[in-house]
Swiss-Prot record:
Gene encoding the protein: DNA-S
Entry GO terms, CC: T=1 icosahedral viral capsid
InterPro entries: Nanovirus_coat
Full protein name: Capsid protein
Keywords: Capsid protein, T=1 icosahedral capsid protein, Virion
Chief location: virion
Source taxonomy: Viruses, Monodnaviria, Shotokuvirae, Cressdnaviricota, Arfiviricetes
Amino acid sequence: MVAVRWGRKGLRSQRRKYSRIAYKPPSSKVVSHVESVLNKRDVTGAEVKPFADGSRYSMKKVMLIATLTMAPGELVNYLIVKSNSPIANWSSSFSNPSLMVKESVQDTVTIVGGGKLESSGTAGKDVTKSFRKFVKLGSGISQTQHLYLIIYSSDAMKITLETRMYIDV
């Protein structure tokens, strides 16, 4: 089955269906890798974006993998949000430490997912923790919208963020 026909979906009637099968449009995977140092008791964020240029795409789902090196007993809260406009200042948009969306940006920000990560271990040794979050974005995020990972850390720590974006170009 080499013929590709996208555009037609659904039924004409219950007895008479479309004669040709409608296939899904092609999707591709884009992987990115970012390393950063988080400051103590600070709200920071990173934009999840497949391309730096203005090519046309629609993101359908994202897999976020974060690995953190932190001291025992520390806490990391994170939110995954989508926004119609770019977020310039993280601290003015999200509360500290609970990461609640402030009233000034409530109309433009939608929370997609979130969670927390706590470390345990013996004192004096750093602990490496990680989380993997798979986020389905429904109808998708176009190139005019923005997807962010917002992080609050209770202590200074190193983070490695890897993302795999499933996009339709």
